[in-house]
Amino acid sequence: MISWADSRKRVQEQGVKKLYYMSAEFLMGRAFSNNLINQGLYEAYREAFWEMGLDFDKITDEENDAGLGNGGLGRLAACFLDSLSTMELPVLGCGIRYEYGMFRQKIVDGTQIEMEDDWLRDGNVWEIERPELSVEVHFNGTIQENWTENGLKIEHKDYNTVIAVPYDVPIIGYKTKTPATLRLWSARSKRRFDFHS
C-alpha cells in the first residue's frame, strides 16, 4: 500500500499524463493469489502456510471473486490494467462497483436455478472508500435552454439525484513498484428513507 500511495503522489508531483480506462466490466479475479504471484511471493507464502499447518489453497479459495462483470471484455479490461501496471504507466481504471456480481447457479431436480452473487457480503479488504471524492449524478428531468446576452445557458430541472461514491483498488503489476488504480463507483440515494410517509 505504501508503494501505491507513493506512486500516486509521484504522478501528481511530476504532472505527468495519466491514462483513464473506462469499462462496464473488470474481471480481476481473486486479488490475494494474483498479488502474491505478481510480487514473486506466491511460493514463499505457500511454504509459510504449510509450516504453520495451514491449507494455503483452502484459505485462498475463501476470497470472493470480485463480481464486476461476466464476459470477455471484463477479462480484457483486467488484463489491460495489469499490463499497464507492469509497464509502470500511470493508469486509472474506471468502472461500476456492482453490489451483486455474476449470478451463481445450482441444479435442482434437473432445473437450473439462478441466485445472486453477493460478493460484497464479507466486505472487500482490497478497496478503500473515497467519500471525499463523491459526486452528485443527475438523471431524468428536463433541459431548459435560455439565450441571454452572454450566450446560451442550459439548465437541468426536476431531475433525480444519486450520489456516486468511489472505491479505489490497487492493481499490482508483475514485479513492479507502481500499482495502477481501479476506481469503482457505487450509487447511493441522496435522500434518507422516510419511514413515516
List each language-model region with its residue ranges.
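A conserved ligand/cofactor-binding region detector
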Residues: 1-197
